[in-house]
Amino acid sequence: YLAAKSSLTQAQFHRQGVGAGSTLVAALQHGTVVCGMTTQPTVSALETQKIAYSAIDLATTDGADKWLGGAFPSAAVLANADWVNANKDTVQKVVDALVATMHYIATHSAADIADHLPPNFVSNGLVTKDLYVKALDQDKGQFLPDGMMPANGPDTVLAVEKLAGKVTAPVDLTKTYTNDFVVAANKLEGFAQ
């Protein structure tokens, strides 16, 4: 999408999967790739080690608005509609846990969150705990406190997919997602008015 938006053709670049974390760091250090797309804490590790810098921010609301035209929901509970309809109790339990997690993230500091994660996740060969906390604090805004689909999210995703050539037929966005389970989870958890 970003290439198409900048009028680059697929003949002008190629994609290569190198993973995230230490494998992306190594790929950049050894010239296997010259540009990468990743998330925190890899971004902070790359910047701190002066291996790379953030050219495009897609992790914040402002960055998504600037580069994608609006909110771009990327973390979700994804399942086939037939399975969802046949397993509503299970789906509700998963969404309840996700909403409780989003609320926890919104109401706790990055340091509090890091204290409850596995030690080797927040402090390892790639990042220190302090760097992890700093990165999480910087990017906490990408986690929506109520877990609801952002109002313009589906439209943004569709526009991106169309420009990237992934969607060529009409799409009824109302059939692609539901907030029903999220609304119920917020009520159950006591987060809804």
Say what each PLM segment does.
Residues 155-193:
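Conserved C-terminal helix/tail region of periplasmic/extracytoplasmic solute-binding proteins
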